[in-house]
Amino acid sequence: FFTAIAGGLEKADITAILASAEEAAFPIAAQRGQCGTVDVMTPYVNGLKEKILSALGCAKDEKPFSGLKIVVDAGNGAGGFFAERLLEPLGADITGSRFLEPDGRFPNHQPNPENADAMRSICDAVTETGADFGIIFDTDVDRAGAVLPSDGGVIALDRNRLIALMTAILVRQYGPITVVTDSI
């Protein structure tokens, strides 16, 4: 474990954790556990849809992205669902989205919106398809970059530019706010 304030664990810390685990009494369960499959994506995607529809003031059956072409570059990471299970059902045309199937070898480009080749990939996708918007995710979908068409070219919104755009949206909704970021 590592934190910016406390730093990483020292050898003594790790030794203490291992000793604690070794000494812990793990009682035998009264009955045997079970293995199974649980669908976590459907409730997650439905929750995202509800948040989007609510934020846009739309009814549950509306398709607020109808008429918009939105391309996604998932970089063969976990973000492919975003195009097929979220944007498309909300009405977006996702034709031209790329690398939606997870592949841990990442054969197309590094799945990192801060990587120049990756950003070039989503910029090309927006230009080639005439998309209204492009979004690129990292491997585990906790970072993103965005692309907007502009006068025959594109504007890449990564790192601070994306934070600035989100801040502008939030200021309109909530008034003055404080934003803390480590995206520099």
Where is each model-derived feature located?
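Gly/Ser/Thr-enriched, mixed-charge loops and adjacent short helices
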Residues: 1-129
